[in-house]
Amino acid sequence: MEFARGQNLRKRTFSDMNISYKNIGIHPNSLPKNNLSRKILFKGKISKNSIPKDSLTNGKSSKNCMSKNDLAKDNSPKKGLIGKKRSAPLDISFQSMNSSMSSSTQKKTRILDEKNKDQSSSNENDRDSPVIVDITLKPSYTSKISRITEIIHKMKELNINRIEDGLSFNKKRNEHDAKNILLHTMEMVEEDCEEEEDVIIENPYLNASLSEDDTDSIVGTDYSEEEKESISETESSSDGECYSLYDSF
């Protein structure tokens, strides 16, 4: 098995990469796309098929070869891309059309075509080219917290609405019950009044204070004076007989 020299590997790894300084370490798509550099950067080893023949020396490869351990040692993160910290994506980042942009990092893109009304002004020259607005989602924990707070607020609103609906319903129900009670009492009073009127009609002299004229009119005073005296004598004699009977006992 033939191995490549470390010098050739470093030359092909870092000189053939066409990557801007801003995109270093942001996403794997921004790394070189040839198999050689990918395997060196991520696995620390290369296979025979992935190395082009031009990079291998003729005749001196066996003397100046590197083992796998030496190759891993040479891939130190001093000068290369390995070991670079990955920058956190911003919530909203503006990039021009010419700059390379990976499709996985951007969630929503929108092209804003802004035309200059006054092309002579230097401040508005940057607006000639369209701009891509990259809106990436926030981390998951923030979205969960915001979602939980939204759910709590919605539940509070629903509970408040239910309480208000219940209060209004209870008010309406109480008013309805009060109206029913008033109607029922009014009906009872009317029935009592009707019964009293019926009793008064049947017995017109039951609760009335009767005078002597009324008694004379009720009994019918067609008697003569002699008859009245005889009636009074009979009443007095009957009273005396009753006393005599009681006294005998």
Swiss-Prot record:
Keywords: Early protein. Residues 93-106 have a biased composition (Low complexity). Residues 51-67 have a biased composition (Polar residues). It comes from the Viruses. Residues 51-131, 205-240 are annotated as: Disordered. Induction: Expressed in the early phase of the viral replicative cycle. Belongs to the asfivirus DP238L family. This is Uncharacterized protein DP238L. It comes from African swine fever virus (isolate Tick/Malawi/Lil 20-1/1983) (ASFV). The lineage of its organism: Viruses, Varidnaviria, Bamfordvirae, Nucleocytoviricota, Pokkesviricetes.
